[in-house]
Structures are given as structure tokens and as C-alpha cells.
């Protein structure tokens, strides 16, 4: 079931093809000042392509980066959408920079019955159900009295043709009232086990000096997610080092997951997005001479690593004990363990 869907298609001669189905409005994208990709591109294409990068699949943790800057380059100098899937939640992070100041809006096409409840959009189709929860730059206005929430996202219901052209269906647009030229959008898509599930992840919005993030409580685990505000290209000639809750890093984004009641330093599951180091006090948890994308897990005495980002990768990872085995991108590698650090070298993407 496509619980969040694209609008579909229709036969070419129908005006709805070129006026709607071929356009950005028919997809789950961000519009700027009401516009998406240039409509001229349906006739001439785009010389600048979009790309998918750095796919990591570590079972309950997955990541991929979608770079749509090229096709949007008439309006955007930066149009990145990160997908980070941890357990039952997909975090969608939009990193957007435009040439001019204006209004951003997020489009959502439900593949089922949609209902706004407070700050959430609930979508249900049979036994499938998700919650779409915008968290940054603002929450969704809690009630229909949007004038009581002048800074929060307000929603618009838009009617559009169905794929069979026999009627219309509704999609949603979430508008940011502020006029800006740079924004971080973070939306949580919560995958419900059943439509009636009540015990959903509890999410705290958190921020500090030069970072924003979340703390997620769910099923006895805590996940801390951090987004580095200095690592988005705004400082071309300066480092992007931040300190967040005792973690010191230059990573664009990172997450640590640990059991409730434990200290974050005891985490056995880390995600690092475009970073060269992660330290806490005098202890190095990850280090490399080049910025990498990494998922690290310690399970049953084994260290598992998923790595991408460079043609050849060398890095060190903290481990309190010498692991029984080290598996990198699905392959068993020799265990090189020195002074609490597992060293891997010569990793290439095949």
C-alpha cells in the first residue's frame, strides 16, 4: 500500500497530464513561492540532474540522501532531502537554501483516508497507518484557529484530479508563514503497527548552540538526533565543530541510541552523517581523516559497520572490549584493536 503516494499519471493528450501529473504539485515535495521545478523542463528537460547518494542499510537503521538541487537550480542553491529510518520512524530532513526570500510549503499526498489531529496528519488505508508529524521549522498549528498560532505551519487542502480522471482527491500543503531564504525542515513519519495503536514515540524538540534536534523515547530506548547548523554550507572557510550534550563533532548530523536509564556514552548504535569525528570528553568514539557516512552497531560481541562517502575509507571506532569479529559493509574484516579502538582501513564501495 502506498500510504503516502505520488498522484499518478494519465494518458499524454489529456490536459491534466501537462498541467498537473507532470508537475511538482503532484508529488511530495517542497514548493517555494508556490513553484516547484520549472514547467519548461517538461519540454526541454534539465541539464542538471538530481541524485541519490550514500545508501546505508543496517536493518533497523537506514539512510539515503536525495539531492534535488540541479532540477530546482533556478530557485534553489541547496535542495537536499535526507531520509533517516530508525526503528518505526522515518525522519525526513529538508535542507533548503534559495536565491531569494520567500515562502516554503510542504506537499503531502495521502494514499488513504487523511485526518488532521492536533499537530499530526494521520493517514490510514486498511490495516496500514502512518502519522506525519512536522517538527521543524515549526509544528503544525494545533487547531483550525490558525490565527492563534501565527508562526506555526498552517495547512491547505487542495483538490486535484484522480489518476483515472473520474473525480478529484485531496492533498495537503503545509505552509510556513515566515518569509525566509534558508530553512531546515524535519518531519517524522511514524509507522504504526495498527491503525488503533496508541503508544507512539514521544518526541522532544531540542536545540542548543548551533544545533537543533530531537530526543525520541520509544519501547524502552532513547534516540538523540542532532543536526549541525554550521555544517550546511553557510561557512565555506570555517570548520563546523559543535558541542551538543557533551558530544563534540563536525558531523552534519548524528544520532545515538541507548537503553532508557543508561548514559548516552553507553550507546551501542551510532549514525554519523558526513563527519570526521565524534568525541565525548577525552574519549574518541569515531575518527577519520575524511568525512564519512557511518552506521555503527555492537551486537553479541561483534562490531558491524556500514560506511560510505569516500573512494577509500580509513577510520577508528571505540570499543570497550576487543570484538569477536568486525563486519564492514557485509564483509568480515581482520580485527585490528589498539587501546580501545577498532581500526578499519582500505574500505572501498563495490
List where the protein language model places each region.
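Zn2+-dependent peptidoglycan hydrolase active-site motif and core
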Residues: 9
Amino acid at each position: 500500500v502506498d500510504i503516502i503516494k505520488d498522484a499518478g499519471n494519465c494518458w499524454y493528450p489529456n490536459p491534466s497530464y501537462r498541467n498537473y501529473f507532470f508537475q511538482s504539485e503532484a508529488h511530495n515535495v517542497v514548493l517555494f513561492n508556490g513553484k516547484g521545478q520549472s514547467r519548461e523542463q517538461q519540454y526541454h528537460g534539465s541539464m542538471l540532474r538530481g541524485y541519490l547518494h550514500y545508501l546505508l542499510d543496517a536493518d533497523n537503521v537506514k539512510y539515503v540522501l536525495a539531492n534535488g538541487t540541479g532540477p530546482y537550480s533556478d530557485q534553489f542553491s541547496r535542495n537536499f532531502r535526507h531520509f533517516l529510518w530508525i526503528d518505526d520512524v522515518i525522519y525526513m530532513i529538508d535542507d533548503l537554501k534559495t536565491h531569494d526570500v520567500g515562502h516554503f510549503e510542504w506537499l503531502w499526498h495521502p494514499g488513504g483516508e487523511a485526518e488532521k489531529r492536533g499537530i499530526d496528519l494521520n493517514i490510514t488505508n486498511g490495516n496500514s497507518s502512518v502519522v506525519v508529524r512536522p517538527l521543524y521549522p515549526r509544528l503544525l498549528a494545533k487547531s483550525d484557529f490558525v490565527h492563534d498560532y501565527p508562526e506555526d505551519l498552517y495547512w491547505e487542502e487542495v483538490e486535484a484530479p484522480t489518476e483515472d480522471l473520474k473525480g478529484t482527491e485531496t492533498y495537503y500543503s503545509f505552509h510556513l508563514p515566515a518569509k525566509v531564504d534558508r530553512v531546515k525542515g524535519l518531519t517524522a513519519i511514524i509507522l504504526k503497527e495498527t491503525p488503533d495503536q496508541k503508544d507512539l514515540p514521544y518526541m522532544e524538540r531540542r536545540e542548543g548552540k548551533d544545533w537543533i534536534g530531537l530526543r525520541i523515547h520509544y519501547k524502552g530506548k532513547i534516540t538523540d538526533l542532532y543536526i549541525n547548523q554550521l555544517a550546511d554550507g553557510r561557512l565555506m572557510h570555517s570548520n563546523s565543530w559543535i558541542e551538543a550534550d557533551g558530544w563534540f563533532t563536525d558531523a552534519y548530523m548524528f544520532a545515538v541510541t541507548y537503553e532508557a536509564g543508561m548514559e548516552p556514552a553507553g550507546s551501542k548504535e551510532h549514525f554519523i552523517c558526513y563527519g570526521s569525528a565524534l568525541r565525548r570528553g577525552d574519549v574518541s568514539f569515531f575518527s577519520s581523516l575524511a568525512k564519512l557516512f557511518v552506521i555503527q552497531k555492537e551486537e553479541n560481541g561483534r562490531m558491524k559497520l556500514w560506511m560510505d562517502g569516500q573512494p577509500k575509507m580509513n577510520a577508528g571506532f571505540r570499543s570497550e572490549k576487543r570484538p569477536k569479529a568486525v563486519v564492514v559493509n557485509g564483509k568480515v574484516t581482520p580485527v585490528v584493536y589498539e587501546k580501545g579502538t577498532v581500526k578499519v582501513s582500505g574500505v572501498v564501495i563495490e
